[in-house]
Amino acid sequence: MEDFVRQCFNPMIVELAEKAMKEYGEDLKIETNKFAAICTHLEVCFMYSDFHFINEQGESIVVELDDPNALLKHRFEIIEGRDRTMAWTVVNSICNTTGAEKPKFLPDLYDYKENRFIEIGVTRREVHIYYLEKANKIKSENTHIHIFSFTGEEMATKADYTLDEESRARIKTRLFTIRQEMANRGLWDSFVSPKEAKKQLKKNLKSQELCAGLPTKVSRRTSPALRILEPMWMDSNRTAALRASFLKCPKK
């Protein structure tokens, strides 16, 4: 999976994912599914923002080629991908400037046109189930939720999809391509199935002979990106329990 991620995603996205996992004490060579999940979520966030600007009249426009003479402002502020300190600094700055209510949880984007924070979700499950889970957690009408699936489905707050159909189609196509490429390499099942992921994690630990250097305690912290993506394959409690079950060295 690690090789696939490095081949499939932009190096900048891979680097950001590596930093996120390192910040939370996660080993990408072992937890390769998380590595892939973070990269996927980051790419969707960046694609959401790509080419969208606000012109001098305050209108939202799509510009694919930069015009140095155009006075354009990026429509979206990207919050995801920053370390927690910087991310909250950006959020506080936005709130002070726009008067927006400060969210309880770190969002992924801020939309300067609609003046709202956006939470992006990516899931392999039914989008409405994941949407309800996200809404129940956030419990704020001021944060807009937009969920995408690997099957081309999507769901958003009040059926307001924010982006034009073509922009959303690019995201859906990319997710479908990622799914197909994983399937072609025999990686899809382990990416989305807890049972298969457990087998893969055990295989990774065994093949790398990491037992001697493994920590004795399991980190319970969850990175910001994984708050969105973790349900794609397992929840945090199962992740911690799974990791703990493999941290025991075999008796000599």
Curated annotation (Swiss-Prot):
Q: Where is this site: Important for efficient shutoff activity?
A: 28, 65, 202-203, 206
| Site positions per UniProt: Important for efficient shutoff activity and nuclear localization | 195, 198-199
> Which residue spans adopt a coiled-coil conformation according to this UniProt entry?
none
Q: Name one GO biological process term.
A: viral translational frameshifting
Please name the InterPro entries in this protein's record. PA/PA-X (IPR001009), PA/PA-X_sf (IPR038372)
One of this protein's Pfam families, by short name?
A: Flu_PA
Localization per record = Host cytoplasm; Host nucleus
Q: Which UniProt keywords apply?
A: Decay of host mRNAs by virus, Eukaryotic host gene expression shutoff by virus, Host cytoplasm, Host gene expression shutoff by virus, Host mRNA suppression by virus, Host nucleus, Host-virus interaction
Q: Which GO terms describe its molecular function?
A: RNA binding
Q: Report the active site residues.
A: 80, 108
Family of the protein in this entry? Belongs to the influenza viruses PA-X family.
Domain remark from Swiss-Prot or TrEMBL? The probable endonuclease active site in the N-terminus and the basic amino acid cluster in the C-terminus are important for the shutoff activity. The C-terminus acts as a nuclear localization signal. The C-terminus is recruited to host protein complexes involved in nuclear Pol II RNA processing.
What does the function comment of this entry state? Answer: Plays a major role in the shutoff of the host protein expression by cleaving mRNAs probably via an endonuclease activity. This host shutoff allows the virus to escape from the host antiviral response. Hijacks host RNA splicing machinery to selectively target host RNAs containing introns for destruction. This may explain the preferential degradation of RNAs that have undergone co- or post-transcriptional processing.
Annotated protein name in UniProt: Protein PA-X
> Per the UniProt entry, what species is this protein from, by scientific name?
Influenza A virus (strain A/Hong Kong/5/1983 H3N2)
Query: What lineage, starting at the top, does this entry show?
Result: Viruses, Riboviria, Orthornavirae, Negarnaviricota, Polyploviricotina
